[in-house]
């Protein structure tokens, strides 16, 4: 009877039409939501959700409600001043993964934002795109228009790039290609205005071992050595977040409501049509409902979008039946295909460290205070760098990573491996089929010299992070209860495909080669971790099981945009198979991980999603 009442209420709203909401600021209370009507409900106010909501509400007659599980930040220094960076206050609490079988059953916290603006509030601000091959790989999975040529206009539309000064560009060997950068979009980005002096030696070392400069890592190829652009507003030298770029400018629109600190429990359906959502306070409380006359757009993130779908009856049949959830659409791919980028740490001491460096910043309060004075005067300052990062990065192709090592056969061994051996034994045949196709695409990508599979980042003193950005392993995220406030079951299944260990071994040796180059060797580095005793593959893998990090906070791909017969969940228009009026518009819709940090690509994909939605409703010219 309760469900019937909900549907009858929704139908009565449809008869009245989706009226424009009352004229007040976007941030609203639950009571105000109950007295309003909406065309669209966006589940999640992260980068994707805010981008799409902003673009839809540019049309005055289109009303949108965004429901975000977290708060709106208060403009704290630890968010907006890069040198004060602290992510923990806005991280989802208690979100841990299952014991990782290949990592000695270690348990890790999953880093997920719970705040308006999502990852753009808590990440390290790196603003790199995926490569042309990354997106062409998406398109080859049946997603027409999602290749590089289809995405590049949306990168340009989303961005507002500020060029560095000639002096900074010369000092930091910063180069770029203006023709592929956007200059009129909402998302401001540039380069921090301070260069640690030791980074010049890293640049020389990279050149010495054959890593070439990259003119522009955002131009479709991202291998080489380069300075990373950051999501920083060069007018204020503060973090450029989705909250500031896509929320603040729209805050006074009467057709845009934002409900914070509120969790969506499930999508409401009339048959197979999504008509609204149930929601409750994130701290706990009673269930309320809101209705969408046109569509529900899910953007809850790669770990929570599958949870929302599964709680709503969209997901693997066996899972839903076990929890007595009525099945709306049997989609085995919901929650499968989870991916993230792994990190292996190096630790060094130095006989002659180049200073000032990151340790100077962290430990010398006098110097740090002097630098803060410069920052507050908008002068060059270390405070424009996301603490404790340095902007120089070396990204390696598969060929670069394995050159001059005994590991050139890694890819051949991977191709000989049965894809089923890398997935759970009970995996659905369609998901297995999709994974097998993804592997073939990845094998082709890895042969290209312009696509990065891994890289190194040095903080200018003790710490180096070595990344595998294109893992073969696939994990999952599933619910095990119907409480919408309970965390889902998460397992990255790191190194379930041993190719990922082998690639990390090759990258480890490449890192050692880099620091043995004359410009860095002259400083007298001593490798503490892994340490000189760790040499054999067996020793390296043993250590990786102890210290490898399975998540870089770049979770993706858990509701993939692929054909249904390949375990896909979404059409190329991001529509959920077996339903109407329901789309997934966040990073969950990616079929496979990109070769770099995701933020810039999330903005661009959000712009594309907004245009797809506008086009289908006849609003594209608005």
UniProtKB/Swiss-Prot annotation:
One BP annotation, GO: shamixanthone biosynthetic process
Pfam families for the chain: GMC_oxred_C, GMC_oxred_N
Residues involved in FAD binding: 47-48, 68-69, 123-126, 598-599
Subunit structure: Homodimer.
Swiss-Prot/TrEMBL keywords: FAD, Flavoprotein, Glycoprotein, Oxidoreductase, Signal
Disrupted gene: phenotype observed: Impairs the production of the xanthones shamixanthone and epishamixanthone; and accumulates variecoxanthone A and emericellin.
Domain of life: Eukaryota
Entry EC number(s): 1.1.-.-
Pathway in which this enzyme or protein is active: Secondary metabolite biosynthesis
Listed GO MF terms: flavin adenine dinucleotide binding; oxidoreductase activity; oxidoreductase activity, acting on CH-OH group of donors
Glycosites: 160, 173, 357, 364, 480
Gene3D superfamilies: FAD/NAD(P)-binding domain, Glucose Oxidase, domain 3
Function statement: Dehydrogenase involved in the conversion of monodictyphenone to the prenyl xanthones such as emericellin, shamixanthone and epishamixanthone. Monodictyphenone is first converted to variecoxanthone A via a paeciloxanthone intermediate by the consecutive actions of the FAD-dependent monooxygenase mdpD and the xanthone prenyltransferase xptB. Variecoxanthone A is further prenylated to emericellin by xptA before being reduced to shamixanthone and epishamixanthone by the dehydrogenase xptC.
Name the UniProt record assigns to this protein: Dehydrogenase xptC
Organism (species): Emericella nidulans (strain FGSC A4 / ATCC 38163 / CBS 112.46 / NRRL 194 / M139) (Aspergillus nidulans)
Entry keyword annotation includes Flavoprotein: yes
UniProt cofactor(s): FAD
InterPro entries (alphabetical): FAD/NAD-bd_sf (IPR036188), GMC_OxRdtase (IPR012132), GMC_OxRdtase_N (IPR000172), GMC_OxRtase_C (IPR007867)
Cleaved signal peptide residues: 1-18
Family (UniProt): Belongs to the GMC oxidoreductase family.
């Amino acid at each position: 009877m309760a469900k019937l009442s909900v549907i009858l209420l929704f139908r009565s709203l449809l008869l009245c039409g989706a009226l424009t909401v009352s004229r007040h600021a976007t941030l609203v209370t639950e009571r105000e939501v109950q007295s309003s009507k909406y065309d669209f409900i966006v589940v999640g106010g992260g980068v994707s959700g805010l981008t799409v909501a902003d673009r839809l509400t540019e049309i005055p007659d289109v009303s949108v409600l965004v429901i975000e599980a977290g708060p709106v930040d208060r403009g704290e220094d630890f968010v907006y001043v890069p040198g004060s960076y602290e992510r923990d206050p806005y991280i989802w609490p208690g979100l841990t993964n299952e014991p990782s079988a290949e990592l000695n059953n270690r348990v890790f916290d999953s880093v997920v934002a719970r705040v308006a603006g999502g990852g753009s509030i808590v990440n390290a601000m790196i603003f790199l795109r995926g490569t042309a091959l990354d997106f062409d790989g998406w398109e080859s999975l049946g997603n027409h228009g999602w290749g590089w040529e289809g995405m590049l206009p949306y990168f340009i539309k989303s961005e507002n790039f500020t060029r560095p000064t000639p002096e900074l560009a010369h000092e930091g060997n910063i180069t770029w290609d203006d023709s592929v950068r956007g200059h009129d979009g909402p998302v401001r980005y540039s380069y921090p205005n301070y260069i640690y002096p030791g980074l010049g030696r890293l640049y020389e070392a990279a050149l010495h071992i054959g890593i070439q400069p990259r003119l522009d890592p955002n131009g479709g190829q991202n291998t080489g050595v380069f300075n990373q652009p950051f999501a920083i507003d060069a007018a204020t030298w503060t973090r450029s977040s989705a909250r500031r770029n896509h929320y603040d400018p729209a805050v006074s629109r009467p057709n845009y409501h934002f409900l914070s600190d509120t969790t969506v429990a499930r999508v409401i359906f009339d048959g197979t049509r999504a008509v609204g959502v149930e929601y409750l306070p994130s701290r706990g409380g009673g269930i309320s409902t809101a209705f969408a006359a046109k569509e529900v757009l899910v953007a809850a993130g790669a770990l929570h979008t599958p949870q929302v779908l599964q709680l709503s009856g969209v997901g693997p049949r066996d899972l839903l039946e076990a929890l007595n959830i009525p099945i709306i659409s049997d989609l085995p791919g919901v929650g499968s295909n989870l991916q993230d980028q792994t990190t292996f740490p190096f630790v060094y001491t130095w006989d002659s460290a180049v200073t000032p460096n990151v340790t100077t910043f962290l430990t010398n309060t006098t110097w740090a205070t002097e630098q803060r004075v410069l920052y507050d005067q908008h002068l060059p300052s270390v405070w424009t760098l996301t603490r404790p990062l340095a902007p120089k990065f070396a990204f390696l192709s598969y060929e670069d990573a394995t050159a001059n090592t005994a590991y050139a056969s890694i890819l051949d061994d991977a191709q000989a491996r049965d894809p089923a051996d890398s997935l759970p034994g009970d995996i659905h045949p369609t998901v297995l089929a999709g994974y097998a196709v993804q592997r073939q695409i990845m094998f082709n990508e890895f042969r290209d010299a312009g696509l990065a599979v891994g890289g190194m980042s040095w903080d200018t003193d003790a710490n180096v992070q070595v990344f595998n950005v294109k893992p073969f392993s696939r994990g999952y995220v599933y619910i095990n209860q119907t409480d919408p406030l309970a965390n889902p079951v998460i397992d990255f299944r790191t190194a379930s495909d041993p190719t990922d260990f082998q690639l990390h071994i090759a990258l480890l040796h490449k890192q050692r080669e880099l620091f043995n180059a004359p410009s860095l060797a002259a400083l007298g580095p001593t490798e503490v971790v892994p340490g000189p005793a760790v040499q054999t593959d067996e020793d390296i893998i043993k250590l990786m099981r102890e210290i490898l990090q399975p998540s870089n906070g770049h979770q993706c791909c858990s509701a993939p945009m692929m054909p249904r017969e390949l375990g896909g969940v979404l059409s190329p228009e991001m529509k959920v198979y077996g339903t109407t009026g329901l789309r997934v518009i966040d990073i969950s819709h990616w079929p496979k991980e990109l070769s770099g940090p995701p933020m810039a690509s999330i903005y661009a994909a959000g712009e594309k999603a907004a245009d797809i939605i506008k086009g289908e409703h006849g609003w594209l010219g608005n």
